[in-house]
């Protein structure tokens, strides 16, 4: 009798957990708003569900509420994540792996993480959707303080530490700490207290974290000289580590992220690599609204796509308070380290935060770049075979032995500086109807040869350049050249209030070319900028380097006096090695003087 009762209860539990093609996670013991550790329960539930799902579409439902995730009992994974610190293992809150035709619906839930964790991973999936939830950390690794007094003569600042920040004064140093981590910050970003915009002309600042004294509860007196930090200014103390993004995608096909808000992550909001066809629909990296006491979101980019293909569609998002771009799209050059024979090279990932993940597959089309001039050398080729040269397989590898279908140009070897670019893993991009505001560094960055459309966005006080087209085989080794870019119907409001890398104008076309004078061809091409509105307090609107084919037409440039002009570039247009330029039918406050407003260099 007792056995029958147990079996009956088990059947009821299983029926409750999966009903009508839907898995209700409450059937796996998950309960909202308890403060209890959800990590082991969700890990077990997702593992069981992954083993059961077939080709039919299923939904995984998380009852609405707050769920807390701790490192204890979390899924442990060894992930090598592009543009992040390669420390392992990663402790994953929700690990979606090898799933097909799955919809995860958080139903408005808040996922709150503790310590140092990777909140969500989606790996090896096909036709999956994640939607309706937010990601945050109870104690972010960024420390926020508010300036109370600034003695500019004595070089002393008194500041108050935000109530959620955990810290101690150790040997007269401010040390931020949390569950399983601590750091002594040296750098920060200053925000206006009332607007949450970056303070004008401050950029990255040193912070008063050394030789300090706690003069009252959470009130610190520090030797710190910076006259721009008036009382009421909010400063975030940050580091430059980026162990994990908020959402990690790898080897996924046809993915949708819908109505998701990332309020904080220690790395990027989203990092997707080697994935195909990604839709972001109202995916945001944002504060919790106007009344959120925080001024920051992520430690790095809001969204980042490395070595992806198909279509990246990002629409309807809000990106604010992050420490870098709202979106960055690129591939990765391998540096040629050895020529084995006329068809075989050894290529290597060169940046310490970008290695360990798959680079290419047999059949992929590639081309070769001379790094100093960023010119294509020889003809396109195809990968015949590829294997890791320094690891048993590609997992964790830095070097790859690549055999090509056709002989490689004899000039390409370890003698010189050459890069290998994978043209197969390059996406089209549609970035539209987004708001990008009050962030550090830049608004957006695109480096793909496929069609890129940037339209109907608002770039509001992005602090540096609003849109950057790059390409770099010398530092980050991020590919590649743009050949079909349409920037239209966007509004740009007071970009360039600060100076950061590549911020030569509101729109900056800035490939890294160490030996520009020796370059014979052009890197970028096919760029059209039209029907946009620019509101600016300064002069530079468009900077371009090494471009063949650039159109700037039907744009409106309105001048204001919101800040003093200070940029070193005092030309509306500054061109270096740019040909086939068309500037016409634009409206400028105060008129346009071609001789004065255009600077062109060969």
What spans do the regions from the language model cover?
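Bacterial Sec-dependent signal peptides at the C-terminal "C-region" and cleavage site
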Residues: 14-22
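The right-handed parallel beta-helix/beta-solenoid scaffold, focusing on the short coil/turn
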Residues: 58, 92, 100-102, 109, ...
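Ser/Thr/Gly-rich low-complexity blocks that favor extended beta-strand/coil architectures
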Residues: 113, 162-208, 355-394
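Small/polar beta-strand repeat architecture
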Residues: 198-242, 377-379, 387-429, 437
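Extracellular beta-strand-rich solenoid/capping regions of secreted or surface-exposed proteins
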Residues: 43, 47-52, 68-103, 112-131, ...
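Acidic Gly/Asp/Thr-rich repetitive segments characteristic of extracellular carbohydrate-active
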Residues: 25-60
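Short glycine/acidic-rich loop motifs that flank beta-strands on beta-rich extracellular proteins
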Residues: 113-119, 139-143, 243-246, 266-272, ...
């Amino acid at each position: 009798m007792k056995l029958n009762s147990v079996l009956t209860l088990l059947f009821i539990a299983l029926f409750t957990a999966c009903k009508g093609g839907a898995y209700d996670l409450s059937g796996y013991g998950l309960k909202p708003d308890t403060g209890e550790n959800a990590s082991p329960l969700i890990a077990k539930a997702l593992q069981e569900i992954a083993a059961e799902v077939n080709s039919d579409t299923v939904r995984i439902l998380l009852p609405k509420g707050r769920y807390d995730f701790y490192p204890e009992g979390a899924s442990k994974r060894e992930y090598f994540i592009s543009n992040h610190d390669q420390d392992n293992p990663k402790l994953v809150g929700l690990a979606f792996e090898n799933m097909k035709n799955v919809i995860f619906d958080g139903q408005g839930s808040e996922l709150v993480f503790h310590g140092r964790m990777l909140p969500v991973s989606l790996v090896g999936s096909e036709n999956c959707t994640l939607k309706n939830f937010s990601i945050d950390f109870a104690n972010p690794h960024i420390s926020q303080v508010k300036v109370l007094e600034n003695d500019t003569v004595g070089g002393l600042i008194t500041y108050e530490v935000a109530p959620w920040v955990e810290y101690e004064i150790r040997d007269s140093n401010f040390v931020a700490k949390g569950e399983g981590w601590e750091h002594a910050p040296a750098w920060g970003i200053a925000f206006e207290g009332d607007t949450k915009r970056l303070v004008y002309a401050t950029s990255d600042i040193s912070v008063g974290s050394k030789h300090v004294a706690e003069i009252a509860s959470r009130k610190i007196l520090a030797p710190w000289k910076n006259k721009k930090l008036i009382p009421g200014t909010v400063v975030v103390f940050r580091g430059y580590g980026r162990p994990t993004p908020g959402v990690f995608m790898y080897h996924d096909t046809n993915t949708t992220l819908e109505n998701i808000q990332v309020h904080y992550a220690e790395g990027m909001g989203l990092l997707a690599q080697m994935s195909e066809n990604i839709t972001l629909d109202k995916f945001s990296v944002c504060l919790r609204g106007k009344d959120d006491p925080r001024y920051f979101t992520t430690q790095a980019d809001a969204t980042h796509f490395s070595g992806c293909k198909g279509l990246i569609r990002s629409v309807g998002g809000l990106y604010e308070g992050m420490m870098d771009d709202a979106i960055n799209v690129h591939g990765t050059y391998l540096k040629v380290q050895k020529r084995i024979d006329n068809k075989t090279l050894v290529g290597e990932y060169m940046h310490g935060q970008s290695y360990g993940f798959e680079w290419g597959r047999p059949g992929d089309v590639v081309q070769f770049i001379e790094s100093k001039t960023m010119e294509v050398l020889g003809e396109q080729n195809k990968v015949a075979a590829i294997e890791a040269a320094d690891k048993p397989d590609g997992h964790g590898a830095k070097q790859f032995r690549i055999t090509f279908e056709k002989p490689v140009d004899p000039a390409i070897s370890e003698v010189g500086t050459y890069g290998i670019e994978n043209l197969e893993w390059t996406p089209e991009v549609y970035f539209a109807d987004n708001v990008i505001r009050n962030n550090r560094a830049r608004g957006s960055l695109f480096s793909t040869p496929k069609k890129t459309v940037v339209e109907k966005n608002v770039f509001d006080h992005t602090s540096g350049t609003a849109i950057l087209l790059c390409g770099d085989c010398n530092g980050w080794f991020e590919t590649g050249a743009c050949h079909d870019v349409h920037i239209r119907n966007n509004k740009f409001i007071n970009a360039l209030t600060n100076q950061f890398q590549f911020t030569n104008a509101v729109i900056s076309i800035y490939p890294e070319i160490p030996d520009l004078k020796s370059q014979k061809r052009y890197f970028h091409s096919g760029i059209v900028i039209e029907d946009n509105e620019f509101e600016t307090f300064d002069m530079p609107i468009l900077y371009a380097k090494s471009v063949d084919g650039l159109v700037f037409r039907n744009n409106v440039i309105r001048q204001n006096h919101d800040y003093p002009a200070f940029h070193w570039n005092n030309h509306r247009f500054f061109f270096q090695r740019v040909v086939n330029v068309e500037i016409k039918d634009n409206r400028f406050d105060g008129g346009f003087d071609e001789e004065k407003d255009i600077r062109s260099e060969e």
